[in-house]
Amino acid sequence: DFVVVNGENAAAQGVGLTEEICKDFYNCGVNVITTGNHVWDQKEIMKYIEKEERLLRPKNLFEPAPGRGFQIFKTDKNIRVGVLNLMGNVFMKKCDDVFETSKKFLSEYKLKDDYDLLVVDFHGEITSEKMAIGHFFDGYSTCVVGTHTHIPTADTRILDKGKGTRKKTAKASRSVV
């Protein structure tokens, strides 16, 4: 198994996360924590994200940003899992163009060459942007999962090239791919 959690709203008042919360997730079996627009709301996370490769921030945050937005992990069965964390542009003003970042990413990394599976966590506000990213990565990823806490999880799809997409997962404590 390989567990990815979007933990950006796990801290008090539902904004950000802390080192302690990350460690609690890891102790529960989480392999990777992704984030979104609330990644920096708990300032202590800025130091921790620099040293913790299992904690990702959106790759398309304005540079220079602490941490990383993509990492390749190996499972117990030696399967290489790439996890890419992206954030939408609609109503999210802290990031570069998600499609340009995605295009650059796909020119640098290839499914099966660099990793066996690619999980894309797309943190965004609107369903149409999540669907557009799903189609953008169709055939280039294993799955695309849309995260944020504003819409219900009721829209799983298998796209033309056989990859599933889900525009929304549950909150951090239940957000498992």
Regions found by a protein language model. Give the residues of each.
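Acidic, metal/ion-coordinating pockets
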Residues: 1-177
